A protein has these predicted regions:
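Glycine-rich flexible loops
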Residues: 1-222
Length: 222
């Protein structure tokens, strides 16, 4: 019995450690995202209404407290660990090109469905990486280390969201909230069938010249 409880606790600790990678504004804005692990005594899943970037509750599937609305996708998965989150740097670029880039994880793309029960069967199968169009991603594996590896591979796309609309965007290009705001603006512009009008290389370079000392200092000290 003691050994079983230790195994269960280790599984939960592994889940918490993996989740720490995606508990940030770029991966899980707001209260979005949910994670789970299947252990010796059943399924443990993030409680509804808790944020991944804060200390969150992991509850047993039979707990009286409300589990995530998307518990179906976790229960239907054949894998031990399931992590669903909403990386703002991946959602805008979901396409067939990502299937080639992440082919070793047997990825697939699922067309948009309403979050919740409509997505309950999307985790069925051998796909360790699932792209949910206009929604997010699902990472699943029997190995905690492989889940961590997939998350790290996806995170390589974080630096690619660098749309410079105005001088302060360029200066604060590594600020998470600025990146989030720019991604939102970009999606809004594209959804309106408008063209992005960004700062060019010459304009960006000029921001670091003496007549932009204020921003040059910000750039140097941030």
């Amino acid at each position: 019995m003691f050994e079983d409880s230790m195994i269960i606790q280790n599984d939960l600790d592994d889940l918490i450690e993996i989740t720490s990678k995606i508990g940030n504004v770029l991966d899980s804005p707001g209260y979005g995202g949910n994670v789970s692990v299947k252990t010796l005594d059943g399924l443990y899943i993030k409680a509804s209404g808790t944020a991944l970037r804060e200390p969150f509750q992991i509850i047993h599937e039979n707990d009286s407290r409300k589990a995530s609305l998307e518990i179906g996708m976790h229960k239907n998965s054949k894998f031990k660990y399931v992590l669903h989150y909403h990386p703002i740097y991946i959602i805008p670029i979901i396409s067939g090109a990502l299937l080639d880039r992440f082919s070793k994880y047997n990825p697939k793309i699922v067309e948009y469905r309403t979050p919740g029960a409509d997505l309950s069967d999307c985790t069925v199968g051998d796909n360790k990486l699932i792209f949910l169009r206009n929604h997010g991603v699902i990472v699943q594996s029997d190995s905690a280390s492989e889940c961590s590896e997939i998350i790290d591979d996806l995170a390589e796309y974080k630096p690619k969201i660098k749309y410079f609309y105005c001088p302060d965007d360029f200066v604060m290009q590594d600020n998470p909230e600025q990146i989030l705001a720019n991604a939102y603006i970009s999606l809004f512009i594209k959804s309106s069938n408008l063209e992005l009008d960004t700062l060019g290389t010459e304009q960006c370079n000029k921001l670091l010249t003496p007549d932009e000392v204020y921003r040059q200092n910000l750039k140097r000290t941030k």
